[in-house]
Curated annotation (Swiss-Prot):
Fluoride-specific ion channel. Important for reducing fluoride concentration in the cell, thus reducing its toxicity. Na(+) is not transported, but it plays an essential structural role and its presence is essential for fluoride channel function. The chain crosses the membrane at residues 1-21, 32-52, 66-86, 99-119. It is found in: Cell inner membrane. Belongs to the fluoride channel Fluc/FEX (TC 1.A.43) family. This is Fluoride-specific ion channel FluC. The keyword Transmembrane helix applies. InterPro entries: FluC.
Amino acid sequence: MQWLAIGLGAAIGACLRGWLARFNPMHHWIPLGTLGANVLGGLLIGLALVWFERVGSGLSPNIRLFVITGFLGGLTTFSTFSVEVFTFIHNGKLLAGLGLIGLHVGLTLLATALGFYFFKLVL
């Protein structure tokens, strides 16, 4: 049952990531879809951490696997982020690559903290 929960969550997360990828060409040096997927994933994992701690403790562990390992693992995309940064650096756009690293890491950490602390206030 664990593998089914993870697989189903991953499929849904990957479909959302695929939909968000439509926004990648909108800006010439910021792949907005990848950035959006990672920032949204950061926000949602912050919310999920608090929710599972406060509300979801009595739930089946498969639900946590579905949400965190499956859905959020399928949604967020470190490998795509890595190849986008590498492509900039390989094409001589070092500052763009470094800027992209800063955007992804900074915004994702900020979103995680916002989700975490917002849900702590609400629950």
